[in-house]
Amino acid sequence: MRQAPHRLIDICDPTEAYSAARFREDALREVELIRDAGRLPLLVGGTMLYFRALERGLSPLPSADPDVRRELEREAQELGWQTLHSRLAQVDPQAARRIHPNDPQRIQRALEVYRLTGMPMSEWFARLVDADRLPYRLVKLVLAPGDRDVLGARIADRFHAMLEQGFLEEVKALRERPGLGPDQPSMRSVGYRQAWAYLDGRLTRDEMIERAIIATRQYAKRQLTWLRSESGAERFDALSPTLLNKVLKWLDGISCLHQTDL
């Protein structure tokens, strides 16, 4: 990250909610600024739903309804979010496959959309409006590891490195923040959720580490599934020792990269 300027990192307070719609606005603004400076933006990530929103635009999903949300929260308190996830699987199997059973924010939103409209959220996403597509040509590269065992080991190494670099101290400091609790979207993300439970005394250190690593591996699996369905993308084995040469050769072979390309 020291070798090139990065945008849209550390732009929100942990108490703030962040959406795909807001990301699209922020990303389009940064793309224009980079192009105005005569540079080529590289979009790197990440959360595939956000990338798809940037590329294709957003369907006009209904706004949040406080009454429906309160109803869903009451049901979750009585039955548990995993039961609500099972209900989601009945009305929107595609969304249920994409959303983890321990992700109450997205389970709630998907069920809310269905209850408000009678239409599954996945169908809303399928109706993304072409008129709002990204007004550039995208050159898409997918870098995915060919060996899942290596990926799993690197995920474990990464979390251990995070702990060594003060991750728990970061979460302890966040716990002192007013208005920030374990139900905030930022604190339900992978790693933070398990660390918070450990600091609450609900998990041992070993349990925290194991669950955080498992959750990260599950997240990586979902990302790889999404990447396999990404159309118009060139795929490379991220573990190949000749990866750089292969990518550069492929880029050299792309003809007529216009000024409107990304």
Describe the function of each predicted region:
Residues M1-L262:
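Phosphate/pyrophosphate-binding catalytic cores of soluble transferases and nucleic-acid-acting enzymes
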